[in-house]
UniProtKB/Swiss-Prot annotation:
Enzyme Commission number, as recorded: 4.2.1.17, 5.1.2.3, 1.1.1.35
Subunit structure: Heterotetramer of two alpha chains (FadJ) and two beta chains (FadI).
Subcellular location: Cytoplasm
The keyword Isomerase appears for this protein: yes
Keywords (A to Z) from UniProt: Cytoplasm, Fatty acid metabolism, Isomerase, Lipid degradation, Lipid metabolism, Lyase, Multifunctional enzyme, NAD, Oxidoreductase
Region (Enoyl-CoA hydratase): 1-190
Domain of life: Bacteria
The protein's name in its UniProt record: Fatty acid oxidation complex subunit alpha
UniProt region (3-hydroxyacyl-CoA dehydrogenase), positions on chain: 306-715
Species: Salmonella paratyphi A (strain AKU_12601)
Length: 715
């Protein structure tokens, strides 16, 4: 074997072969097509060495086993037949591993995902570490695919069909103890003894196949299987709304393997993989994956980042508490919270405690780790402990004079290099920095709620913000586990600007008599996780509508909302889920009761509530306004690229990922079709639908947003 091989064979003195996996020049092990020859050469040596007692596959990387297959391989396939051949080659390689005459053990530390888990499943036994970095799963569905190297066939036979369906249909990842309980691994050990434990397991004679739990055995029988698959199909269809063809194919392939045997199952798996690889949904989902990977590598500016050793936070409310948690518990940075009273500080501390305690209860971390992370967060009602903070995040009320005061106080009480980052959602960063002594160190850092769940942040430099300030802020966002996009300092920034007309139109249709549930269902059918009216309830009607006057003042009537309707709702003390009354009614806190539309909402706004528009018409009216505004943002350079615009919409507001984001979706529709549709809607509903200049120009020139070699492989 050459020194550049990703798979290195070493035979120990005790006649156990250790195959170390180490992809040269990469931080993470991924499976590439060219590795097949390397693996086959090693398997040949193993078969020929009659003295061997066993084989151990183990990673030489610090914190990952195999994170999956290199997705770029799929992009090189010209048709379904080529992708199917790729899957069959993977299946054959895994079959050769499984057919080895001696015990084969996968020793797993870190991420074992996709093709990595399929390789581990081909081994006779699996053993993993108890480290928090160790996760096992088959996430191919998130790319519009299914596991193509035998995963759909081996996993159900190992852990049972219901557990396998749960893992493969949603790409669920199991931690070490969960994997042990499910029967996915045979043992969990500390990392320090992983190799020796795997070697000892390899020396044993092959153990009998694990007996599945009674429930799984019943479900594997003809009657149980028929009932299970009928229920799973129904539940999956309700969840995906038919927008994700991979889920239906996953169910088909697993059922085929169980009903007709593994040979038929492998054949069905390969064919389905090939067909899914060519679907527009998979191409779009892969594009989102590549774009998000690129964004995470983007430093934000050409300047090197400044020091980032500790962070301050002003305000211990909902946002401040969430920001403190991601900074300390994900970023590992010491955090000092300042609030005007101890109640605010205690709220922020409890916020982190609750999240960490949930992890302890679920056995994701130990109590000692919880205490260690919580110790990174401290608080004060003054600026003690702030003098050495490298960056201070302001999360106080949306009040310009107050935020300007915060800038002055930070400049007075912190170091000369300290960056001031405002979490404002609507106020111009330039205005916040207007009186600053060091305006080059003032920037916007807009988080989305709930902070611990939403992956996106907007980084907003104003005209005088330095390149180093941008780079340092982007670096912080990445440490917090966020995906940052840099956007211009214009009203609404990017995400709220494209979201506002979408929600406004939903409210406008409500005033025309359309029913709440019909509007929401139409946009869920289109592919959004929740409908626009439910989203407004979730965000808070008072909070969600606060930005509308700002946008209307900046951009004119196209941002005007039915003001009398919003006022009537707010005057009736309807804030949404947070006070149990919005467009929907909510049960008592903690109850699982299904939310219901409050029929009083129709009387409140003076309509009958009888839907006349089709679901397609409802979705078109909302989505077209969002797309038109996104194109304006591109034209005005609010976003730096179509890539950032797509990621911002998918990660910030749940734009359907199977469409690739608003810009890929507009490219798919074509600029000519976009302009024609907007003109038709403008004739029906008014000038707010007038196509923007950017789209008109692109239609005339037959241009697209994704150009200059930007492909679904992120080149």
């Amino acid at each position: 074997m050459t020194t550049t091989s990703a798979f290195m064979l070493n035979v120990r003195l005790d006649n156990v072969a250790v195959v170390a996996i180490d992809v040269p020049g990469e931080k993470v092990n991924t499976l590439k097509a060219e590795f097949a020859a390397q693996v086959r050469a090693i398997l040949k040596q193993i078969r020929e060495n009659k003295a061997l007692q066993g084989v151990v596959f183990i990673s030489a990387k610090a914190d990952n086993f195999i994170a999956g297959a290199d997705i770029n391989i799929i992009g090189h396939c010209q048709n379904a037949q080529e992708a199917e051949t790729l899957a069959r080659q993977g299946q054959q390689l895994m079959a050769e591993i499984q057919a080895l005459p001696v015990p084969v053990i996968a020793a797993i530390h870190g991420a074992c995902l996709g093709g990595g888990l399929e390789m581990a499943l081909a081994c006779h036994r699996r053993i993993c570490t108890d480290d928090v970095k160790t996760v096992l799963g088959l996430p191919e569905v998130q790319l519009g695919l299914l596991p193509g190297s035998g995963g759909t066939q081996r996993l159900p036979r190992l852990v049972g069909v219901s557990t396998a369906l749960d893992m493969i249909l949603i790409g669920k990842q199991l931690r070490a103890r969960q994997a042990l309980k499910a029967g996915l691994v045979d043992d969990v050990v500390p990392q320090t003894i992983l190799l020796e434990a795997a070697v000892e397991l390899a020396k044993k004679e092959r153990l009998a196949q694990r007996t599945l739990p009674v429930r799984e055995r019943i479900l594997a029988g003809p009657l149980g299987r028929a009932l299970l698959f009928r229920l799973v199909r129904k539940k999956t269809a309700q969840k995906t709304q038919g927008n994700y063809p991979a889920t239906e194919r996953i169910i088909d392939v697993i059922e085929t393997g169980l009903a007709q045997g593994s040979s038929s199952g492998y054949d069905a798996e390969a064919r389905a993989f090939g067909e899914l690889a060519m679907t527009p949904q998979s191409q779009a989902l892969r594009a989102v994956f590549f774009a998000s990977t690129e964004v995470k590598k983007d430093p934000g500016s050409d300047a090197p980042p400044g020091p980032l050793n500790s962070v301050g936070i002003l305000g211990g409310g909902l946002m401040g508490g969430g920001i403190a948690w991601v900074t300390a518990c994900k970023g590992g940075l010491p955090v000092r919270i300042k609030d005007i009273n101890t109640q605010g500080i205690n709220h922020a501390l409890k916020y982190s405690w609750d999240l960490l305690e949930t992890k302890v209860r679920r056995r994701h971390i130990k109590a000692s780790e919880r205490d260690k992370q919580l110790a990174l967060i401290s608080g004060s009602t003054d600026y003690r402990g702030f003098s050495h903070r490298d960056l201070v995040i302001e999360a106080v009320f949306e009040d310009l004079p107050l935020k300007q005061q915060m800038v002055a106080e930070v400049e007075q009480n912190c170091a000369t290099h300290t960056i001031f980052a405002s979490n404002t959602s609507s106020l111009p960063i330039g205005d916040i920095a207007a009186n600053a002594a060091r305006p080059e160190q003032v920037i916007g850092l807009h988080f989305f709620s709930p902070v611990e769940k939403m992956p996106l942040v907007e980084v907003i430099p104003h005209a005088s913000t330095s390149a180093q300030t941008i780079a340092t802020t982007v670096k912080l966002a990445k440490k917090q586990g966020k995906t940052p996009i840099v956007v211009s300092d214009k009203a609404g920034f990017y995400v709220n600007r494209i979201l506002a007309p979408y929600i406004n139109e939903a409210i406008r249709m409500l005033t025309e008599g359309e029913r709440v549930e019909h509007i929401d269902a139409a946009l869920v059918k289109f592919g959004f996780p929740v409908g626009p009216i439910q989203l407004l309830d979730e965000v808070g009607i008072d909070t969600g509508t606060k930005i509308i006057p700002v946008l209307e003042a900046a951009y004119g009537e196209r941002f005007s909302a039915p003001a009398n309707v919003v006022a009537s709702i707010l005057n009736d003390d309807r804030k949404g889920r947070k006070n149990g009354r919005g467009f929907y009614l909510y049960g008592e806190k903690g109850r699982k009761s299904k939310k219901q539309v409050d029929p009083a909402i129709y009387k409140l706004i003076g309509v009958q509530g009888q839907s006349r528009l089709s679901a397609q018409q409802v979705a078109e009216r909302c989505v077209m306004l969002m797309l038109n505004e996104a194109a304006r943002c591109f034209d005005e350079k609010v976003i730096r690229s179509a890539r950032d615009g797509d990621i911002g919409a998918v990660f910030g507001i749940g734009f359907p990922p199977f469409l690739g984001g608003p810009f890929r979706y507009m490219d798919a529709l074509g600029p000519g079709e976009m302009v024609a549709t907007l003109q038709r809607l403008a004739a029906l509903y008014g000038p707010r639908y007038a196509p923007c200049e950017q789209l008109v120009r692109m239609a005339e020139r037959r241009e697209h947003f994704w150009t200059n070699g930007e492909t679904d492989q992120g080149n």
